[in-house]
Design a protein with these regions (language model features):
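Substrate-positioning beta->alpha
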Residues: 11-17, 31-53, 60-64
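Glycine-rich Rossmann NAD(P)(H)-binding loop
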Residues: 8, 30-35, 63-70, 81-84, ...
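Conserved beta-loop-beta element that borders a ligand/cofactor-binding pocket
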Residues: 1-9
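Residue-level signal for the nucleotide or nucleotide-sugar donor/cofactor binding architecture
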Residues: 37-43, 71, 131, 146
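A short C-terminal helix-loop "cap" of Rossmann-like NAD(P)-dependent dehydrogenase/epimerase domains
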Residues: 19-30, 113-116, 134
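Mid/C-terminal beta-alpha module of Rossmann-like enzyme folds, strongest
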Residues: 51-116, 133, 149, 153-156, ...
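Active-site loop of classical SDR/Rossmann-like NAD(P)-dependent oxidoreductases
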Residues: 117-133
């Protein structure tokens, strides 16, 4: 199973880290967030994984797994901005993001600490690729149970319960 960007409860890279960056005002979109985000809600990934374990023909096969759609990063991270009650997320051009990434990569060589942002991250966040999950649909019977809207609603509930967002009154 090769999952897209896994979001939902306990996902550090695609849930916890973005909400922390948005809450602190440090989140920045690249090129206005028009790159494509391929995503999968954690429960959808679990469904696909369990389905693969039940089929002998899946042994040795590669299955791309996502929620079956891609959205621009500005929409994906926009859900988190709404949850955090932040009106918008700032943007920087790709060339600037790459320069910043290079600077952080060089600095990390001297500090021994991993860079917080890299040129590869800048490329990733501006990519226009889409996951094709037809093989998983056909061979595993995979069908995402949760849409992005449903997954984000459940994620918001978890973020509030876990203390990453204030509890609603």
């Amino acid at each position: 199973i090769r999952p897209a960007n896994v979001y939902g409860p306990c996902s550090n890279p695609w849930t916890i880290r973005p909400i922390k960056l948005i809450n602190s005002g440090q989140m920045i979109l690249i090129n206005k967030g028009i790159g494509l985000c391929n995503y999968v809600y954690i429960d959808n990934l679990i469904d696909a994984t369990l389905s693969a374990t039940k089929r002998d023909q899946s042994v040795g096969q590669v299955y791309l797994v996502s929620d079956g759609a891609a959205v621009m990063w500005k929409e994906f991270f926009g859900y988190y901005a709404q949850m955090a009650r932040k009106p918008s997320i700032r943007s920087a051009p790709q060339w600037l993001a790459k320069v910043i990434g290079l600077g952080m990569e060089i600095t990390s060589r001297f500090t021994g600490k991993p860079p917080k942002f890299t040129r590869e991250a800048a490329r990733f966040l501006t990519c226009q690729a889409r996951f094709n999950i037809e093989k998983a649909r056909h061979e595993l019977g995979y069908q995402p149970r949760f849409s992005l809207q449903e997954g984000m609603k459940l994620t918001e509930q978890w973020l509030r319960e876990a203390g990453y967002l204030p509890k609603e009154k």
